[in-house]
């Protein structure tokens, strides 16, 4: 299993915790990682990626590119540290907890989960909360989050 973390910013990241979160989700969901690249970037880079690949001209918390289907996972995901910071303030969760949540969310996308409908978002949110608890990261109130 290859999990590579890439930080394109100057902000220090809890790399061991992030890798642990990726491994936890894969293990609990029955996934096997062939190769996962996690790229942590700033808002400008994320906006460019979001515009180029998805046609959305704004920053977002994560963009995921699965290169396989099913439980054998190969792919990459990008996480905007700027958006993580804004969400941490918005949801009163703290930066590290929000970073772990978005990382977990990204891995769930690589495993085929979607969040296009309220039901799908709710299912993903429950899984995120569960994995955050297992990691000892706590869970902020999900009331406002359910609107997103």
Curated annotation (Swiss-Prot):
Its cofactor is Zn(2+). InterPro entries: MetalPrtase_cat_dom_sf_prd, YbeY, YbeY_CS. GO terms for cellular component: cytoplasm. Zn(2+) binds at residues 105, 109, 115. Keywords: Cytoplasm, Endonuclease, Hydrolase, Metal-binding, Nuclease, Ribosome biogenesis, rRNA processing, Zinc. It is an enzyme of class 3 (hydrolase). The keyword Zinc applies. Binds 1 zinc ion. GO terms for molecular function: metalloendopeptidase activity; RNA endonuclease activity; zinc ion binding. GO terms for biological process: rRNA processing. Its EC number is 3.1.-.-. It is found in: Cytoplasm. SUPFAM superfamilies: Metalloproteases ('zincins'), catalytic domain. Single strand-specific metallo-endoribonuclease involved in late-stage 70S ribosome quality control and in maturation of the 3' terminus of the 16S rRNA. HAMAP family: Endoribonucl_YbeY (MF_00009). Belongs to the endoribonuclease YbeY family. This is Endoribonuclease YbeY.
